[in-house]
Amino acid sequence: MPSRLPLQVTAFYRLFLVREYESLMVHFSRKNGFILYLIYLLDRKLKGDKADTLDLSKYKKLFGKLYNKVYGINGESFFTEMMKNYNANNEVQQKGLYSALKSIRDDIGSTCDRMQEPAEPFILRDIASHLAVLPERIILPEEIMALA
């Protein structure tokens, strides 16, 4: 008789794309991508039309708090790793940040495709852009909003 294994919880929060009565969960391929996207969502929700390019280096503490809330792990070390500008050979790189941003584009884009929605307002073109989705369309739990 097969034994029942407990369901492994990998995250305490999920992101859904919702249209009227239809919703699809966004499957983030990278944890850093999900947390980074939450930061962009919080920025857009709180600043509205005044949302602008984020200086990500200023978001280490928020990244850590969000990572802890979502995954139950302090994420400041993950942020530091993601933001490294140089590798062990002292060569310029930002592979971690690039990978996180690419995962956001890919993961949000594929969810929008499955829902037959244009991805434009929900994705980031590059590190210098901000989300175009209307702030009133962003619904985040109070405990996430309180961290900002």
Show the residue positions of the predicted features:
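Intrinsically disordered, low-complexity protein-interaction/activation regions
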Residues: M1-A148
